[in-house]
Structures are given as C-alpha cells and as structure tokens.
Amino acid sequence: MAPAAPTVLVVEDDPVILRLLEVNFDLEGFNVLLAQDGEEGIAVARAKRPDVIVTDIMMPKVSGLELVETLKADADTASIPIVLLSAKAQSGDLRAGVDAGADDYVTKPFEPLDLIDRVNALLSR
C-alpha cells in the first residue's frame, strides 16, 4: 500500500499565486487545500489538520504572522509545520516570522519547485 499523499494548506490572497501554488503542489502529488485569507486559513487548518501550511504574510482580516501565532498556540495545530511566503525580505521580517513560530520563510519572487523542496524537507523531519 502506497503512503498517503501529504496535504498542504495554501493561504494566499493573490488569486494568481494561489492558483500557481495549487497547480504545482498538485503536480508534485500533494492533496491541496486553499484559503484566501488568514481567517479562512485558521478555520481550514483546524477543521482539516493539513500536514503542512504555506501562507502569505500580508493578507486581509488576519495576517500570516497572526495565523502562525494562533495555530502554534493551539495544541491541536501546534505541530503543523508552517512556511511563510512573503515579498518582505528584510532580516527583521524573517526574525518576526521565526519569533511567531514559523518553521521556514520564503521570499517572493520564488521558484515553485524550490518551495516544494523546502516543504518536503519539513515533512521529512
């Protein structure tokens, strides 16, 4: 019996990037869940318990940093690895992401397959 495909939750308010990530993760064998803002991302994460989350930082309603802090503070979702994806590339931005509890930080623009490699590395830990 083949192992179950990992499930990734992609949280991104830009529909073009959301679709790009959906297609690439799907092509690499992931089950893909989608959310268009941080509030929806938190709800989907709690309901579906994905294996990993990739989230933008700057989003309406709830930011990616708030999403990370909320999910890492919840015993039911604290162990889910989270990758922050952002156009913010200053060292202070990276520090804020790590301080919030993110497991990795990828800056835009990015190569989708490089991001997927980093996600796979997190899943293999």
Over which residues does each language-model region extend?
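C-terminal output helix
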Residues: 110-120
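Short hydrophobic/Thr-rich beta-strand motif most characteristic of the beta2 strand and flanking loop
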Residues: 29-36, 44
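Receiver (REC) domain active-site loop signature in two-component systems and cognate sites
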Residues: 59
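Active-site beta3 strand of CheY-like receiver
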Residues: 48-54
